[in-house]
Amino acid sequence: MRTEIFSILTAFLLVCGCNSGSRTEGTAAVSLDGTETESAEILPITGTFINLPYQDVRNKYTNPQHLDCTDPSLWTAKVARMKKVGMEYLVFMSVANEETSYYPSKLMDWHYPDWRKSPVDAIMDAAAEHGMKVFMSTGWAKDQDDNLRDPKIKGRQIEMMTELAGLYGEHPAFYGWYLPVEDCFGPVLTDYAVEAVNALTARARELTPSAKIMISPYGIFNSDFEDPRYEQQIARLTVDIIAYQDEIGCVRERYPLTRLRGNWKKLRAIHDKTGI
């Protein structure tokens, strides 16, 4: 299984390494200390996360509380703009929250009026119209703090995946799954996180064999790259894509850029060594 490395910028932008389209050749790159380094290929940002529920004050810019985020016309327009600025991949952060759904679920109540199109359907249809690819979320079973140690939470995410596969598995915009198992990579990824990811992945392979599967763990700022278990845990994962959160803009690390390039190099070496 080939795992591609993605980088998330400011928690919601995705550097999509699987895009072989437009690339820019740079004549020189500037290092963090201001000196010029060897020429490097620049990959454009070609994907973004979509955040439907307003969860707390951290969403005030990406998802203003005063907007109706369930309005299908809003998302039709947004997706068109995303395509215009070069987005090819859309990732649902979640399609349910606090046991209400943003799609026509039979498992829970709807978070939008039943007389109009769901926001998930609006986004999927607009994405198909513009030739874009969508990663469908399997959360939240409850909320953004879903604990996959809880069998009920993991079971509900699998139920949601089954329902979503039935609704969107054959949709022309459906490309894969985003598993919201956002566990911490520091110091190493936990056993329970690996097991939860692989359990969800196994079900996803049964439902949609050709779909790509992505996770987005956090915490590389305090990862113990020298611990042999760090590499071993990555090798155990059965996903296709790891979208590492660089956490720029977060409060976990005051100056994340100072170590970011070095961290990416270490991760690249680990992935090359394991061959995944």
Q: Which residues does each predicted region cover?
A:
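Glycan-processing catalytic domains of CAZymes
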Residues: 30-276
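Positively charged n-region of N-terminal signal peptides that target proteins for export
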Residues: 1-5
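Bacterial signal peptide processing site
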Residues: 19-21
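C-terminal motif of bacterial Sec signal peptides marking the signal peptidase cleavage site
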Residues: 15-17
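Sec-dependent N-terminal signal peptides
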Residues: 6-11
